[in-house]
Amino acid sequence: MKVGIIQQHNGADHTDNIHRLQERIRQLAHEGAELIVLQELHNGLYFCQTEDVALFDQAETIPGPSTESFGALARELGVVIVLSLFEKRATGLYHNTAVVLERDGSIAGRYRKMHIPDDPAYYEKFYFTPGDLGFEPIDTSVGRLGILICWDQWYPEAARLMALKGAELLIYPTAIGTAAYDTPEEQQRQIDAWQLVQRGHAVANNLPVIAVNRVGYEPDPSSVTEGIQFWGHSFVTGQQGEMLCDLSQTEEAGAVVELDLERTELVRRWWPYLRDRRIDSYGEITRRYID
């Protein structure tokens, strides 16, 4: 299967951001991509740098304008697309939601982000209610997709549950970067850790991983912080964590990567982690901390 990934530097103009994304989707589809994954909250700026009630106006329903627009494109091109949207579920109830569009433009399923951060410049708890759909893979014409979002990528439990439910791919739309006050050495440690933990999920579950990050500098509209330099480095790994693609740290980019999903069977025969799990001994994993 051929997978397309797009990392983009967004501005405040949603119409322009969407237009540029859709042009890149067309390009990757023409290069043979069957599945195309976009970055987290891809329609606009990463608005969670500040707490502002007016920004809830950016949320949309699902189905809604984005699923209609990108759905028409999926239908035209015959590709599966993974969107990442600010969902308005009901009055006063909002989620950070990934939506999978089938080749015919229909909604194959959605995933609501489960782990919600609350850190300087990442004030997501102000905007998003934690997901309530669980860790459920989404069946599509290109395979069973284990969709997770950004902060979820640091939790091996999420990847494992997707794998145990038959996911054939692990997919992470992402918005992550460094602060201006971080030293170059610290910035590199963070990037390395981000890639390593997800490559570890690939190894531990013998599944390909697709991580798509945004790229470029976005200022903090409140001026409380110095903004975020999103570090790009969108990447794809194989079932043993091997890097198949690693995009630029500073530039917009896209790529088409070929994955062999049948290789999972072979690798799991070599490394039978699922066979050897001691499920009789893991009960305490559900506790916050074992005192």
Residue ranges and their predicted role:
Residues 97, 110-112, 233, 246, ...:
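Residue-level detector of high-confidence beta-strand sites
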Residues 4, 99-101, 235, 255:
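Conserved hydrophobic/aromatic positions in well-ordered beta-strands
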